[in-house]
Amino acid sequence: MADGKDGMDGKDGKDGAGLLDRLLALVDVDGRLDVRCDLGAGWTLAQAAQTAQAAQAALAGHHIPFHVLLDGDAVVDADGLREAPMRAGDVLMLPGGGAHQLRDRDPASLRRPAEGTLLCGRFIVPAASAKLIRALLPPAMMVRSPGPGSRLTRLLALMREEADAPGEGGAALLRHLSGALFAVALRAAMGDGLPATVEAPGVLALGAHPRLAALVVDMLGNLARDWTLDGMAAHAALSRSSLIRAFQSAAGVSPAEFLNQVRMTEAARRLRAGRESVAAIGDAVGYASEAAFQRAFKREIGMTPAAWRDGGAEVDPSTNNAALPVRQRLG
């Protein structure tokens, strides 16, 4: 088996697309557009980190803040992003929920007629998916605009139109568009043949390495398989040490930890659907016995599968009612 990075360079669109398909099928994402900001000269927007208490209070809602700059220029400070430029059409996502600040690129020029528009919202994923999301994505990521005519640009134009002059059912439509933004932005971040970039690493970066992308796609599609470290390394044609280094570098977790997070996320999703027995779900995600699955689920999620099915999977009430974004002025 090859060691180091031999044979791992270069893009493979098929593997990258397959990876994104599997991940989006695994994690249910809802969205809310909360605020539409009109930006003036010297504007600043600062948000504090999400607290552990807030995260615990919303068992079914791990919130990922996002910001879309429709017009103007900004500077961003966030976890892993320092003095990062943000331009019209860029999307800032905060999977880690950390403190962040956006501000006018040139606050000293207060006499200029500055104009800009910023959309602020959040993606909502089930709490059982929170660890996986934190492994898959960096704490903060800037998705650069692919340019005119791209899917991301067209989606943002529709969000802007609906936020500016909502039609019948506008609140519900904005909710669906905000949820779709998660997938469209990640597609742009993974390339999609366009010059979009993510300015931080994550497991999604494995899509750039054909061997690793193919391995992750097969892991996501065959959770019942008895995956071992030796088997994963052989599948990727890498040494065990190279495989471990690749995962640790991208996500800060080992291949085994990543596999466990994926299995628990899929199990929680199936439990919420409520159509299968606990034993059947455990078998489907790779556990030889119901008892072993029960122990693993409680250790990872903090409650038994039955408790999660009965109450832990309830939707955060704050995400149920669609509402139009509040409009406010900054600067």
Task: Give the ranges of each region predicted by the language model.
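Mature, function-bearing regions of proteins
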Residues: D316-N320
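Short amphipathic alpha-helical interaction/hinge segments
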Residues: H100, D104-D106, A185-A189, G193, ...
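Generic protein-terminus/edge-of-domain signal
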Residues: M1-A84, H100-R105, N321-A323, R329
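Loop/turn positions that initiate beta-strands
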Residues: G89-D90
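A short, Lys/Arg-enriched amphipathic alpha-helix from helix-turn-helix/homeodomain DNA-binding modules
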Residues: P148-R160, L174-S178, L194-W227, M232-A236, ...
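Amphipathic alpha-helical segments enriched in hydrophobic/aromatic residues interleaved with Lys/Arg
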Residues: L119-A180, V184-A189, G193-L194, A200, ...
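Ligand-binding loop in jelly-roll beta-barrel domains
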Residues: R82, G97-C120, I124-A127
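Basic/polar phosphate-binding segments, predominantly the helix-turn-helix DNA-binding elements
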Residues: V184, A188, D218-T265, G282-G311
